[in-house]
Amino acid sequence: MTTTSGSAKWQGGIKDGKGAISTKSGALNDYPYGFASRFEGKAGSNPEELIGAAHAACFTMALSLILGEAKLTAEQMETRADVTLEKQGDGFAITSIHLTLNAKIPGADDAKFQELAGKAKAGCPVSKLLNTNITLDAKLV
């Protein structure tokens, strides 16, 4: 198996502070994040969008594997993961993730596609990691 890493730096307080996110691959290298990008829609990244990107990528790769096992190959798949962060008690929690998949898969019928997409949603490693409500809207186009 593999082990990889991501890292974060932070300077200052919660509202005036500035952070930087990096990944081992270099895909992100000191990319800015902070309170304003997380809660006020300002430029920069935030943990929730990174979790969304990771979940969308993991789910889509898992579905590719599951499709292959069913002798199907996607011509194209596009997945979006909407991650909801809500205030709970004294803190915050990710309360749900909604996956939206649009896929072009020659030879797939909707019933089989829905079954395989559901397996990918339940079985991808990021889904297994997350302790939240995960929903899926999968469409063949």
Region annotations inferred by a language model:
Residues 1-53, 60-141:
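Extended beta-strand/beta-hairpin segments
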